[in-house]
Amino acid sequence: MRKSNWKVNVNGQGMPVNDIINRFWMSRGIENPETFLNPVGNILPAGELKNIDKAAMTFNICKNMPSPKFVIYADVDADGCSSAAILYHYLTAIGVEAEVYINKKKEHGVKDEFFLEDRHEDCVIVVDSINDTMEQYEKIWAQGKQLIILDHHIPNATILENAESLNLVSSAIDYPNPHLSGSGVTWKFVKYLDFINGTNIADNLVDLAAVGIIADVCSVGPDSMENREICHMGFRNLQNCGIRAVVNADEMIAESVGFSIGPLVNAANRMNQNQLALDLFLTDKFTEAKQIVKDLTKIKEEQKKLAAELFENFETMVLEQQDNHCYYFMVDESYGTLGGLLATKASDKWKRPCIVVHDTPMGYAGSMRAVGVENFSAIVNSSGLGECAGHENSAGIVIPKENFEQFKTYIESQLQTLDFTPMVEVDLYLERMQITPFLLQKVKEINRISGACFPPVSVCIENIKKYTIKKLSQGKHLCVETPDMKFLVWNFNKWEDVCEEGILHAVGGIDESFFMGKRTNQMLMQDFIFQPTPKVTALW
């Protein structure tokens, strides 16, 4: 059954393809589609990143030491791994010894464990993993080591006051493109090093920057043309063995990151296999990269199985809080890294804010995901009873135990008047017969660089009759097949919503598949409703 309200922007029924596409661009507010799709000249001067000149000077001083060694301290997510790989490959290309250190689980920032072993490095470069206090940085200085920080998170007042001494280069500090990811900042740093040192290395590392931008859900909309241009360059210049091993092609698109690379890294984080995810981007051997992809795929399947088992318990927990506007789920600490995945599944299923936490010394900590709310993080942070860090409706959360009951009461009071049925904005309303190869080509061009602030093209098709219901992969996936098109939902489990005979109305992304020489139009359904065919009783 339909889970959302649909708001269609363009009724394209009866229109030729070019008119449909023109109306689409108008609805998205894009005045010059050609320069938007193929951006050139939008890379901002690296000098606009504060402290980049000082950081580069520190880098060069260390590089010119006898037998220099750098340690790169990486965040655990795809943006962090990409950032580390950019620096690692740059350093090895100029013949400098480099080692990458990565945290365990989903930890962020320099941790005490880093100091248990002296690696005899001259310089520590922290990428995409900034701390909230000076304590760890002072330890690095106390050991006589130089420090550089490349980041994109908003620093707090203490860090901001010390930005110059920290050699902090961040897109979050007065930079015209605050949406630039950690990998984007790192790429611009090595691009700057190319400029001042007369090398030419960074352009063949831009694919890593593109991966980080898409994976970290940074804007690729008209408000960040620099990000779009980095993706434009990176998608067409695949040099990294790990990226090529995943996408198995000479070029990639945003979907390659969102549905392939990102999920593999995320699964490794949740299953405490961060080093393997990092190695995917560090290796320069394609055969090794292919084996890592196989290993990561196996880890992802293990994660999926474990999450499914845990999610079964959520059904019971919901029975005790059905009248709540926000659902709470407690998991064992050993499964804490799965909190984000489980919260996503829960909010998608029950269409409301969902909080998944485990018991920690700080209190109840974990993840929240929300739908039907403009900014759930702001609601949490305004309570004074808990704290969110992350995006508006996708963030980490900490609630002191002594505040938990009061926190729940406060959240409930803030959500009382809200309708949690999400509004799905649909780009185009079309008939099935309008899904031609020419239209699909245009849609693919648009979707090549898509993501935050510029989502892929969505289409509504209604009144689909004479279909056949198929269960794919032993009932894991739904396929509604008509003579000219397939409508698909991956990992489907709501079979009670399926009607064998009726009328289907669907919203989703359109594409085409090729199998045994046959081309088939398809839609990956984001939302749908089956309207049963009324039964007619004969009267005589």
Question: Regions from the language model: what does each represent?
Answer:
Residues 483-498:
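Beta-strand/loop nucleic-acid-binding surfaces
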